[in-house]
Regions:
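Extended, low-polarity transmembrane helix blocks
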Residues: 1-104, 111-179
Length: 179
């Protein structure tokens, strides 16, 4: 009788493979980005210097500057007009709305609660800026494109179902839980 080597094991993408773990890491990292930028808006502090490490986040004032610039430069007149005539004049409200929306996106992604919806929310926040600045050529591989690609992936993949609350919600609601 001859011994045969065991058959190689195959892994499926749906199992807890390296891909699932990488999506989980991407979800958590992107959630931290949104959460920290939301906190920068809440506390109106964008620059941090820890001595050995310094960095900047987007405060409400910086966000208003980015939107003002994008709305002025865009070739999409209705989108620019929306920001110039509605959002920017009402920045006292919209600045806080942005902070709370980023906070919701950050918490959703970080904890994996309705993670696909959170990713779509992030796309809704960042997408218009990228679209308004598309023709300038300045932001193709910089902010906000560096946030768009991960958000697109996270809107497609159910990354919150591994090491996230979406997993428990799927167990409870089954196919009725779409995130």
């Amino acid at each position: 009788m001859t011994e045969t080597a065991p058959a190689p094991q195959t892994t499926r993408i749906g199992d807890a493979t390296i891909f699932v773990r990488l999506f989980t890491a991407l979800r958590i990292f992107t959630g931290l980005v949104f959460l920290t930028n939301a906190l920068a808006k809440v506390f109106e502090k964008g620059s941090f210097d820890l001595g050995f490490f310094s960095f900047s986040l987007i405060s409400k004032g910086s966000a208003k500057g980015i939107l003002t610039d994008a709305a002025a430069k865009t070739w999409i007149r209705p989108l620019g007009a929306f920001y110039q005539h509605l959002v920017l004049p009402g920045w006292a409200f919209w600045g806080w709305f942005l902070a709370l929306a980023e906070l919701a996106v950050g918490i959703g992604l970080l904890l994996g609660i309705a993670s696909r919806l959170a990713a779509v929310g992030g796309l809704v926040l960042i997408g218009p800026i990228w679209i308004m600045l598309w023709h300038t050529g300045l932001y193709l591989w910089e902010y906000p494109a560096e946030d768009l690609f991960p958000l697109v992936l996270l809107a497609i993949a159910p990354a919150g179902r591994h090491f996230g609350m979406d997993r428990r919600l799927v167990e409870r609601f089954g196919r009725r839980w779409p995130f």
